[in-house]
Amino acid sequence: LLVCAAASLNITEPGSTGIGGDMFCLFYDAKTKKVHSLNGSGRYPGAATLEEVRQKLNIDPGADASMPFLSALAATTPGAAAGWVDTVEKFGSGKLSLEQILQPAIEMGENGFPVSELSSRSVSFGYLLLWTIMPGG
């Protein structure tokens, strides 16, 4: 259910969640009474160093700074989709395949769905933001 809901939100609320993002899961196993966690966050290049990133961003060594939101250097490899697969494999009942779990979201994507005003504004803003960052595509 969790993976189906997440995939459905990727279709219906792309400004709030997305397959290009991260995913985290806490799972309570009623049989063992234990909580398990899953980290589906993206990874940054393993060879990258803080010094290298600061140099590329023209930030002096030791200076108090933050990563610019619109910088390509702020991106990580998306981890959500792999996290969904891991969630189904590790915590699923085994009664449904990943394809069956994702089917409702696939159908929404193929057949359409009512778009909320919030989603409409978010998509419009995202389009304008991308156009500003990458004029002409």
What are these regions (language model features)?
Residues 2-137:
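Noncatalytic scaffold domains of N-terminal-nucleophile
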